[in-house]
């Protein structure tokens, strides 16, 4: 995908190999397509839009979003935040999308993204681009899976 002349055409041309929802296989193409939809719908790049509606309101501080050779942000794996920024994202989810008395994300959306959609492995589940723990909707994690993976985990039963 990263070396294709048109990453979006490359993604859309991939064959569907199983019944949707029957088997989980991670694919960075879905976040790439979502990033393109956000950019087209808002008229802003994914990094600029996220900065405006999420990062600045939360006071996340510096961020970096790596881009491919085509200039498109690597939506699946290219975001870099400081640890305190990651903690704030976890706190936002624990607070059902509210931050300092302001709604940053709708509470019903937070509930949907922390609800498992499909079992993956080792008692874990996945849904809406989020990895979750073995107990249904009792935990979520923001997981970095690169060489030095980072994970923020929150036990929602303690919220």
Region roles according to the model:
Residues 1-77:
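Catalytic-site signature segments of enzymes, centered on catalytic residues
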Residues 30-37, 77-99, 151-159:
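Active-site-proximal alpha-helical segments within enzyme catalytic domains
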Residues 56, 88-91, 111, 115:
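Generic alpha-helical structural context detector
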Residues 62-64, 107, 111-158:
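Active-site Gly/Thr loop motif
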Residues 65-76, 96-119:
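A beta-strand-loop signature enriched in Asp, Gly, Thr, and Trp
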Residues 70-81, 131-138:
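Carbohydrate-binding/catalytic loop surfaces
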